[in-house]
Amino acid sequence: MSVNLWAPSASIATLKQRAVILRSIREFFYARNVMEVETPSLSGASVTDIHLVSFNTRFVGPGHASGLELYLQTSPEFAMKRLLAAGSGPIFQLCKAFRNEEAGSHHNPEFTMLEWYRPGFDEFALMAEIDELMQLILDVAPSERLTYQHAFEQVLGLDPLTASLEQLQQLACEQGFADIAKNETHRDTLLQLLFCMKVEPTIGQHKPCFVYHFPASQAALAQICDHDSRVAGRFELYYKNMELANGFNELTNATEQAKRFNDDNEYRKQNGLKQVPMDKHLIAALEHGLAPCAGVALGIDRLVMLATQKSNIKEVIAFDVTRA
């Protein structure tokens, strides 16, 4: 049977539902006096996260005859934090983000992200606000909350905060990942493998579930918790086999943030991965001063999938990567 590749991958009826959801999200924030902003999709720097790959290109123009390397952003986070440091107050953005990774039922290399930041909030206050939005858009019961440690122990019987590399390798072998475990010496890679493949499928099956207090080694751009230096003020939201959101009690210390970027790039160098330019504008903004705040990135396409009961991301976007 022939396929009309000129036609949208989503039905017009679904795209109309999507438009209503986007309008509802905007109204949610307008009612709370959260300002909508726009930031660049192209930047001279990008995320250093070792698990993310950015698209990059070269800009050839006045003053850049040999080409200026630019990256499509995996998230608007860095630029939005610069706005916060400049005194914007609470802000949100609906935008395209780009990740050079696989396409599948839950992934498209170009996708729509909702990101927002709340000065004066910690991760728990932000989780409560996200929960309100989930109830509005998905008409679901209030979310539940689990610590990363409890979720991991409940399914796999091992404390992820105290487990040694050898214990994680053994557990991964027992769970059917011997081909990876026998050569893996990075503790967090094993933690993420086990959590993704074995723990995540058990979370949020009946109602949305926040998993919080991720290991400090996976803090990314979150603060380390004052009460327990083994964990970070980071959380993720899961519902019906999908990771919907990733949020932080934001790191505001410029020195620590620069160290984390450098550590990522050192790991990249040692493991044959491309090093990524550190966002010096973000570091300068943190040096200027970023007030305590919490922020979150939420995948709009996956949210629409849940709201419209679709099983593939291409069913909720106008043109997936095969038709773009």
Swiss-Prot record:
One of its GO terms (biological process) is lysyl-tRNA aminoacylation. PROSITE patterns: AA_TRNA_LIGASE_II. Its EC number is 6.3.2.-. It comes from the Bacteria. ATP binds at residues 99-101, 108, 243-244, 299. GO terms for molecular function: acid-ammonia (or amide) ligase activity; ATP binding; lysine-tRNA ligase activity; tRNA binding. It is an enzyme of class 6 (ligase). It catalyses: D-beta-lysine + L-lysyl-[protein] + ATP = N(6)-((3R)-3,6-diaminohexanoyl)-L-lysyl-[protein] + AMP + diphosphate + H(+). InterPro entries: Aa-tRNA-synt_II (IPR004364), aa-tRNA-synth_II (IPR006195), aa-tRNA-synth_II/BPL/LPL (IPR045864), EpmA (IPR004525), Lys-tRNA-synth_II_C (IPR018149). GO terms for cellular component: cytosol. Transmembrane segments: none annotated. Keywords: ATP-binding, Ligase, Nucleotide-binding. Substrate binds at residues 75-77, 117, 250. Belongs to the class-II aminoacyl-tRNA synthetase family. EpmA subfamily. Homodimer. NCBIfam families: genX, PRK09350.1. With EpmB is involved in the beta-lysylation step of the post-translational modification of translation elongation factor P (EF-P). Catalyzes the ATP-dependent activation of (R)-beta-lysine produced by EpmB, forming a lysyl-adenylate, from which the beta-lysyl moiety is then transferred to the epsilon-amino group of a conserved specific lysine residue in EF-P. This is Elongation factor P--(R)-beta-lysine ligase. It comes from Pseudoalteromonas translucida (strain TAC 125). The gene is epmA.
